[in-house]
Swiss-Prot record:
This is Small ribosomal subunit protein uS17. GO terms for molecular function: rRNA binding; structural constituent of ribosome. Belongs to the universal ribosomal protein uS17 family. It comes from Oceanobacillus iheyensis (strain DSM 14371 / CIP 107618 / JCM 11309 / KCTC 3954 / HTE831). SUPFAM superfamilies: Nucleic acid-binding proteins (SSF50249). One of the primary rRNA binding proteins, it binds specifically to the 5'-end of 16S ribosomal RNA. The keyword Manganese does not apply. Part of the 30S ribosomal subunit. Keywords: Ribonucleoprotein, Ribosomal protein, RNA-binding, rRNA-binding. Pfam families: Ribosomal_S17. The gene is rpsQ.
Length: 87
């Protein structure tokens, strides 16, 4: 169980749920610029395994690093923290 605590855990927003058992999660982070010392926003998309297809487009989710599940999937869904409001 201690090995799982060393895995990376990110929080992001689902931007695509069109694939079966796979979602695309956009994770936004901030880094400081070396020269100017200003915070710069970076974003990255991760393909994530969603076994039961519970996450929908716009949901805020937590994902965890795992073994390679396919050519592009390296993360799995931990939980849906906030559901999207559908208007």
């Amino acid at each position: 169980m201690t090995e799982r605590n060393d895995r990376k855990v990110y929080t992001g927003r689902v931007v695509s749920d069109k694939m079966d058992k796979t979602i695309t999660v956009l994770v936004e982070t901030y880094k400081f610029h070396k020269l100017y010392g200003k915070r710069v926003k970076y974003s990255k998309k991760f393909k994530t395994h969603d076994e039961n297809n519970v996450a929908k487009n716009g949901d805020v989710v937590r994902i965890m690093e795992t073994r390679p599940l396919s050519a592009t999937k390296r993360f799995r869904l931990v939980e849906v923290t906030e559901e999207a409001v559908i208007i």
